[in-house]
Design a protein with these regions (language model features):
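Short coil/loop linkers at secondary-structure junctions
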Residues: 59-60, 120-122, 146, 164
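Conserved non-catalytic scaffold segment of RNase H-like nuclease domains
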Residues: 1-111, 155-159, 164
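Short alpha-helix plus adjacent loop in nuclease-associated cores
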Residues: 130-148
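Short, surface-exposed recognition loops or helix-turn segments adjacent to catalytic cores
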Residues: 95-96, 124-131, 166-167
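RecB-family 4Fe-4S metal-dependent nuclease core
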Residues: 109, 119, 138-141, 165
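A structural motif
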Residues: 145-159
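Active-site catalytic microenvironments for nucleophilic, acid-base chemistry
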Residues: 113-117, 139-143, 160
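Substrate-recognition/cap helix-loop segment adjacent to the acidic, metal-dependent catalytic center
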Residues: 105-129
């Protein structure tokens, strides 16, 4: 089984307009972590970069202009190399299952990122199946098995379950 653990940090919540600022993940194949990546990305021209989003992430606008942050085109090139290393995009059965917390958002951001690079084929690499605890939490709350907490943020649930949280 091929799993792509994925997390994004963005300049807002609109996949088409918000900047993708950070793309991080782990590639796991047959229960072994085989690669990790962490890309810092310069906002694309005209993109939304909400100061509150940066504050939550502990970033500044000035930081986004540093050499640490690469263009979307450069990031796309290196990220695609990772995908191509592990997936045969022409094989319908060879896909990553994407895993993460609220991973639907991350996939939407990634899909917009691909489209800005004139690539409509993200789903040649990833399955429509995902692994995401957030929908399970919502269902278990509706069933009365889990309590309704102040919010459904990952950190809140980690604290509830006594799991160390590292942002």
């Amino acid at each position: 089984m091929k799993i792509l653990f994925l997390d994004t940090e963005t300049g807002g919540v609109n996949p088409k307009e918000s900047a993708l600022i950070q793309l991080s993940g782990i590639v796991r194949i047959d229960k072994k972590d085989v690669e990790e990546f962490n890309f810092f990305i310069k906002p694309f021209e005209g993109s939304e970069v909400n100061p509150k989003a940066l504050e939550v992430q502990g970033r500044t606008l000035e930081e986004l202009d540093s050499e640490k942050y690469k263009s979307e085109a450069e990031t796309y090139f290196y990220f695609k190399k990772i995908l191509d290393k592990y997936i045969n995009k022409y094989d319908k059965e060879d896909k990553f299952i994407v895993a993460g917390y609220n991973v639907k958002f991350d996939i939407e951001m990634l899909q917009s990122f691909f489209k800005r690079q004139n690539d409509n084929y993200l789903f040649s690499y990833i399955s429509s199946a995902t692994i995401d605890p957030l929908p399970c939490i919502g269902f278990l709350q509706l069933c009365g098995i889990l309590p309704v907490l102040e919010n459904n943020k990952l950190e809140t649930w980690c604290n509830y379950f006594g799991i160390e949280f590292q942002a």
